[in-house]
Amino acid sequence: MIQTGSIYRDATMKKPCILCVAITGSLPTKADNPAVPISLQEQVESTQSAFEAGATIAHCHVRNQDQTPSSDPEKFAALLEGLNEHCPGMVIQFSTGGRSGAGTDRGRMLTLAPDMASLSVGSNNFPTRVYENPPDLVNWLASEMKKYKVTPEVEAFDLSHILTAIRMHDRNELY
């Protein structure tokens, strides 16, 4: 049994659920935690372990040699190849988040047509910076996702983002 607050749940999970893993994230480094998978090989191995444990979606970030976030399509292509080989059937979701690049650089990997990609539909304040998602960029990312048949994972950080996502859906702007 797993205790969640005051509720106990059966660890066998009799009802279907979707488990999404973000094994790297955009910020943690080896200095923060030596177990953070940074290299492509580490990411594939960590994702494969999660897949074998039941995860069905992998939310993916890639890194530069110095462990900083990257939007490099070649890195995403290598990761996608490794995950498709070692995690057959897993849904692969790329991050288009702003820590890994500016403007349209954030969506250059969408040409690889992953199953899904994150789509932050508005700007918001993080503790140390503004996470900028101006309407023109959001619309461009959504159109690229639609062009390459990438399902968006809409990220909503406040109520206005939910309304924006509904409007985009109603206008058939989301794949």
Language-model region placement:
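Active-site beta-loop-alpha junctions enriched in small/polar residues
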Residues: 22-26, 63-65, 95-99, 121-124, ...
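Acidic (Asp/Glu)-rich catalytic clusters
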Residues: 14, 51-52, 84-87, 106-115, ...
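Alpha-helix-loop-beta-strand connector modules within alpha/beta enzyme cores
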Residues: 21, 69-94, 140-147
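Conserved, mostly hydrophobic/aromatic
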Residues: 43, 50, 61, 117, ...
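Glycine-rich, proline-tolerant flexible connector loops at the mouths of alpha/beta enzymes
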Residues: 31, 56-78, 126
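Structural preference for beta-strand elements that scaffold enzyme active sites
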Residues: 16-20, 57-59, 89-93, 115-118, ...
